[in-house]
Amino acid sequence: MSEYLQQIAKRRTFAIISHPDAGKTTITEKMLLFGNAIKTAGTVKAKKSGIHATSDWMEMEKQRGISITTSVMQFPYNGRIINLLDTPGHEDFSEDTYRTLTAVDSALMVVDAVKGVEDRTIKLMNVCRLRDTPIVTFMNKFDRDTRDPLELLDEVENILKIKCAPMNWPIGMGKYFKGVYDLYNDEVTLFETGHGHEIYPYKKIKGLANAKDAIGIDLYEDLEMEIDLVRGASHEFDEQEFLEGNLTPVYFGTALSNFGVKEMMDGFTRYAPAPQHREADQRVVAADEQKLTGFVFKIQANMDEKHRNRIAFFRICSGKYEKGMKIFHERTGKQMQISKALTFMAGEREQVEEGYAGDIIGLHNHGSIQIGDSFTQGEKLKFKGIPNFAPEIFKRVKLNDPLKMKALQKGLVQLSEEGATQVFKPFISNDLVLGAVGVLQFDVVAQRLASEYNVKCSYEGVNVTLARWIFCNDEKKLNDFKKKYEVNLAYDGAGYLTYLAPTGVNLQLAQEKNPDIIFSATREH
């Protein structure tokens, strides 16, 4: 295999999906520890610790606004190059979070075993479903009193509609947690407390029968019964089903104590796919093609008001990035030179001179790059599957100075091109309705309108709870629909027809009465 093909085969690009507080920050930190990107755990602070972190990963770099390193972490593990993309939790949750999942080849789902499957996890899994993304699952927090593990598997299968294949099985829980049993290698790994900040060689015992004394007779007998049940009731791991997104291997442990994380990472790097081919409008692009192609899935604004610079996150789909190379911007038809792309290496932030399929690079963007833009080395090619997602929170924008309406419209449309919010212009009023997935986005927009466009605005409630894009192949039926439902219709910032529903029932009735109209929760960029 050539050096070029080896580099591609090494890459594993993924994101972690979880509900806030399920342990994403902790598990990220342990992965960085195993990847030698940090020396001891406990250096990554989550928001509630009071550190000003722009994501959960690094302290804010006040000198240059947002720390770009927080959004992508690259580190080596087991002969692989891991690209871990951040999916923010809590109040900075936005459409970006959803769209990041379109740039990965697999995902790690972290479930809080005390609480089970939660709301945010369901939403993120629905996005993974759009591309049948392979999912690995880590059941976290077994050093606490958790739900019954069989019950947890049942819940994942019923709510998330994915088969579970347990790879290991917990021995006890909470203060009686003794370790995990590897179902495929007949090996017990014994748990000890107090090693969360380091890589610790937990004791292993080959053969379940040989671990009887170490775990105690009562737990041993319970475990034997559980294993019989599990083997009878759950699914065997099947690599093909995993790669098709139909089955998830499940690992148990506690990220805080750094127990079970290594086993999960070993399985992840073994089974998760290398960079996959990508669908474009003209053809399918293979990861091992020689020419550089890729797309922008996220734009991050600089928080430093003196610099209107933005960073466009570019997922390489094929070819090799080299410093100083020229690329073709498909939407504008112009050539663009990449002189100083940012590359992301956890721990060391040196400018790496090259990147391969699966890698993410940051392009400096002064307003010319939009989410969903494709770049090639000359071929006219647009990648598909980088969607806009229907917002979930809506507010009416109130302008403090009516003479600034033009500046407000320009600002809202430009900011919506960055993908954090969406703007809607209703048919029957001069209102501007702003929609977002996360509540923080409204504050960010108001702040940036004031500082970058010199427009002051506030918000008020609006009778909208759901938005759906409208598509129809029959022009007459579409025109009839527009006349009948004009009170609910609007155009989004890019000019697409949208239905703004006051209630879920209203939307359902409109869909039932108009079977030829497509009401879509996503639209392509």
Curated annotation (Swiss-Prot):
<dbReference type="InterPro" id="IPR053905">
    <property type="entry name" value="EF-G-like_DII"/>
</dbReference>
<dbReference type="GO" id="GO:0097216">
    <property type="term" value="F:guanosine tetraphosphate binding"/>
</dbReference>
<dbReference type="GO" id="GO:0005829">
    <property type="term" value="C:cytosol"/>
</dbReference>
<dbReference type="Pfam" id="PF22042">
    <property type="entry name" value="EF-G_D2"/>
</dbReference>
<dbReference type="InterPro" id="IPR000795">
    <property type="entry name" value="T_Tr_GTP-bd_dom"/>
</dbReference>
<dbReference type="InterPro" id="IPR035647">
    <property type="entry name" value="EFG_III/V"/>
</dbReference>
<feature type="binding site">
    <location>
        <begin position="140"/>
        <end position="143"/>
    </location>
    <ligand>
        <name>GTP</name>
    </ligand>
</feature>
<dbReference type="InterPro" id="IPR031157">
    <property type="entry name" value="G_TR_CS"/>
</dbReference>
<protein>
    <recommendedName>
        <fullName>Peptide chain release factor 3</fullName>
    </recommendedName>
</protein>
<dbReference type="InterPro" id="IPR032090">
    <property type="entry name" value="RF3_C"/>
</dbReference>
<dbReference type="InterPro" id="IPR027417">
    <property type="entry name" value="P-loop_NTPase"/>
</dbReference>
<dbReference type="InterPro" id="IPR004548">
    <property type="entry name" value="PrfC"/>
</dbReference>
<keyword id="KW-0547">Nucleotide-binding</keyword>
<keyword id="KW-0342">GTP-binding</keyword>
<keyword id="KW-0963">Cytoplasm</keyword>
<comment type="function">
    <text>Increases the formation of ribosomal termination complexes and stimulates activities of RF-1 and RF-2. It binds guanine nucleotides and has strong preference for UGA stop codons. It may interact directly with the ribosome. The stimulation of RF-1 and RF-2 is significantly reduced by GTP and GDP, but not by GMP.</text>
</comment>
<dbReference type="InterPro" id="IPR005225">
    <property type="entry name" value="Small_GTP-bd"/>
</dbReference>
<dbReference type="InterPro" id="IPR009000">
    <property type="entry name" value="Transl_B-barrel_sf"/>
</dbReference>
<dbReference type="GO" id="GO:0003924">
    <property type="term" value="F:GTPase activity"/>
</dbReference>
<dbReference type="InterPro" id="IPR038467">
    <property type="entry name" value="RF3_dom_3_sf"/>
</dbReference>
<dbReference type="Pfam" id="PF16658">
    <property type="entry name" value="RF3_C"/>
</dbReference>
<dbReference type="GO" id="GO:0005525">
    <property type="term" value="F:GTP binding"/>
</dbReference>
<dbReference type="InterPro" id="IPR041732">
    <property type="entry name" value="RF3_GTP-bd"/>
</dbReference>
<comment type="similarity">
    <text>Belongs to the TRAFAC class translation factor GTPase superfamily. Classic translation factor GTPase family. PrfC subfamily.</text>
</comment>
<dbReference type="GO" id="GO:0016150">
    <property type="term" value="F:translation release factor activity, codon nonspecific"/>
</dbReference>
<feature type="binding site">
    <location>
        <begin position="86"/>
        <end position="90"/>
    </location>
    <ligand>
        <name>GTP</name>
    </ligand>
</feature>
<feature type="binding site">
    <location>
        <begin position="18"/>
        <end position="25"/>
    </location>
    <ligand>
        <name>GTP</name>
    </ligand>
</feature>
<dbReference type="GO" id="GO:0016149">
    <property type="term" value="F:translation release factor activity, codon specific"/>
</dbReference>
<dbReference type="Pfam" id="PF00009">
    <property type="entry name" value="GTP_EFTU"/>
</dbReference>
<keyword id="KW-0648">Protein biosynthesis</keyword>
<feature type="domain" description="tr-type G">
    <location>
        <begin position="9"/>
        <end position="276"/>
    </location>
</feature>
<dbReference type="GO" id="GO:0006449">
    <property type="term" value="P:regulation of translational termination"/>
</dbReference>
